């Protein structure tokens, strides 16, 4: 075997070593601090491989079909956390089952949350008086558009909310929110 001469072996001085160590430590700390920030802006999708977002109740717990139907009667419209965290109405239909669609509760006028008025049997916006029928179709302005629709599916008792991209059955037009 041949020996390398001292001219062929690179040497690292003390200053160069300390600079490398300082840079490595600072980089590690910066990446460690950025990890939670990145997770905040890119959260994992809930719901699994079938797509959709798990509907969550007011405490942030996933909504189950059996639990929801045990506490809600036919005709009930109650809020859950749906797509993108928006308030979304789950509808219990006349057969006592969770409906196939949900309604985004954000008013299309100025973005207020629109409550369900069971006495008037419609959604009435408290901000400027816009009114929507039982299916979320605007019946009185100033809101220019109907409430956005979302698919509601039940997968193994879990209630999932999915993006609605088909024709809006209330207006027979392409959805404005897609």
UniProtKB/Swiss-Prot annotation:
Return one GO MF term. Answer: monooxygenase activity
Entry keyword Iron: yes
**Keyword annotations:** 2Fe-2S, Disulfide bond, Electron transport, Iron, Iron-sulfur, Membrane, Metal-binding, Thylakoid, Translocase, Transmembrane, Transmembrane helix, Transport
Q: Which CDD domains match?
A: Rieske_cytochrome_b6f (cd03471)
Give a GO biological-process term.
Answer: photosynthesis
- Which positions, given as ranges, span the membrane? 20-42
The signal peptide here is none
Which cofactor does the UniProt annotation name? Answer: [2Fe-2S] cluster
Please name every pair of cysteines joined by a disulfide bond in this record: 112-127
Look up the record and report any one GO term of the cellular component aspect. plasma membrane-derived thylakoid membrane
Q: Which reaction does it catalyse?
A: 2 oxidized [plastocyanin] + a plastoquinol + 2 H(+)(in) = 2 reduced [plastocyanin] + a plastoquinone + 4 H(+)(out)
Into which family does the record put it? Answer: Belongs to the Rieske iron-sulfur protein family.
Q: What does this protein do?
A: Component of the cytochrome b6-f complex, which mediates electron transfer between photosystem II (PSII) and photosystem I (PSI), cyclic electron flow around PSI, and state transitions.
Other remarks on record? Answer: The Rieske iron-sulfur protein is a high potential 2Fe-2S protein.
Entry protein name: Cytochrome b6-f complex iron-sulfur subunit
Q: Species name for this entry? A: Prochlorococcus marinus subsp. pastoris (strain CCMP1986 / NIES-2087 / MED4)
What gene, per UniProt, encodes this protein? petC
